[in-house]
């Protein structure tokens, strides 16, 4: 199986399966001299880890990260400094229950990658989906924690903006609310609505999708490239690689098709500091594939997980018709834990383009 790596200069390779002994990543191309602690990486992993509320899978994984290479440990025994060599990180699996998947070892779960993996490779890991499981994304979150350190002044934040047909009220957007509720939503008024809705979904053994918005501030103007090396192109590609993601927008996205040229174009003026400013940000911080210095804004849609208790019609490896009901522990809305994953992937894309821009122009 190939295609386990992404990035050009800031290159990340992930490894491991949902029910294996461990999973992890290797970050290659990280500049030397960047300092961080395992606790900083852990803070992002804790946001993604399962079992934190009744609205996520009850699989209990501490997701404790270990940095194995590519750093020098400081005299304080805590601070690590990158050496410029590959940074390897590992997260052990401690709460896998493969017996839950015995019934579907030969059955194809509707909506999952079971059949696609089997038809391509002639073999699949039925225990939680193997590499196709969202468990793999823990390694991406660890890599994203490093990526945030590569670009000085970069801040990447994410929030859940809709669950099913329920949208937040954007007039109540407050970033301070995101970490104060189990849905990572910036609208405190939507928390009770989301909770009541997901309670019903969860009790019925069903699932629902979500939309997540990522905002990156402090992105240097000029990074990115025209045509085939666009910053927004790579952000979209990185986000589409996340399990269950079915759509990505940059800036106004599909809504731009409903606007006139006067409504959509971002007008400019000179700011008080003598630097250009945009009077709006319909473009989402990218024009011609190159960052403008405005916040980079992306949204991605996550489908409902196909692991539900409702019996669904399918076939097995022998072509027999079967009804499949997925047991085990699953998220009623995988979009909740996709928030830190989306943040990580956007951070990795920006870090890669930052290094590419520096290498090509000598400027940042």
UniProtKB/Swiss-Prot annotation:
GO terms for cellular component: cytosol. NADP(+) binds at residue 48. Pathway: Metabolic intermediate biosynthesis; chorismate biosynthesis; chorismate from D-erythrose 4-phosphate and phosphoenolpyruvate: step 7/7. Gene3D superfamilies: Chorismate synthase AroC. PANTHER family: CHORISMATE SYNTHASE (PTHR21085:SF0). Belongs to the chorismate synthase family. This reaction introduces a second double bond into the aromatic ring system. This is Chorismate synthase. It comes from Brucella canis (strain ATCC 23365 / NCTC 10854 / RM-666). The gene is aroC.
């Amino acid at each position: 199986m190939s295609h386990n790596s992404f990035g050009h200069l800031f290159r990340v390779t992930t490894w491991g399966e949902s029910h294996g002994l461990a999973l992890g990543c290797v970050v290659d191309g990280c500049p030397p001299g960047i300092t961080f602690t395992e606790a900083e990486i852990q803070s992002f992993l804790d946001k993604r880890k399962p079992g934190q509320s009744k609205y996520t899978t009850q699989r209990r994984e501490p997701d404790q990260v270990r940095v194995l290479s590519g750093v020098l440990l400081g005299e304080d025994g805590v601070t690590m400094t990158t050496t410029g060599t590959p940074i390897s990180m590992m997260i052990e699996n401690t709460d896998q229950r493969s017996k839950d998947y015995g019934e579907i070892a030969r059955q194809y779960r509707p909506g999952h990658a079971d059949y696609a993996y089997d038809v391509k490779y002639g073999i699949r890991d039925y225990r939680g989906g193997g590499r196709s499981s969202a468990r793999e994304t823990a390694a991406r979150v660890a890599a994203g924690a490093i990526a945030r350190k590569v670009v000085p002044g970069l801040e990447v934040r994410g929030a859940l903006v809709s669950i099913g047909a329920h949208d937040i009220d954007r007039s109540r957007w407050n970033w301070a609310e995101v970490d104060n509720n189990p849905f990572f939503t910036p609208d405190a008024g939507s928390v009770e609505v989301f909770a009541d809705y997901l309670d019903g979904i969860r009790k019925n053994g069903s699932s629902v999708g979500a939309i997540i918005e990522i905002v990156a501030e402090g992105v240097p103007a000029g990074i990115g490239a025209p045509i085939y090396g666009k910053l927004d192109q790579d952000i979209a590609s990185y986000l589409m690689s996340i399990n269950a993601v079915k759509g990505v927008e940059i800036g106004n996205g599909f809504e731009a098709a409903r606007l006139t040229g006067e409504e959509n174009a971002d007008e400019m003026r000179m700011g008080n500091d003598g630097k250009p400013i945009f009077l709006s940000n319909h473009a989402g911080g990218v024009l011609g594939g190159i960052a403008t210095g405005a916040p980079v804004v992306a949204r991605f849609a996550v489908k409902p997980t196909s692991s539900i208790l409702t019996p669904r019609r399918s076939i097995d490896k022998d072509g027999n018709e079967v009804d499949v009901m997925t047991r085990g522990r699953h998220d009623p809305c995988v979009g909740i834990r996709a928030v830190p994953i989306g943040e990580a992937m956007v951070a990795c894309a920006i870090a890669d383009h930052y290094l590419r821009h520096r290498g090509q122009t000598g400027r940042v």
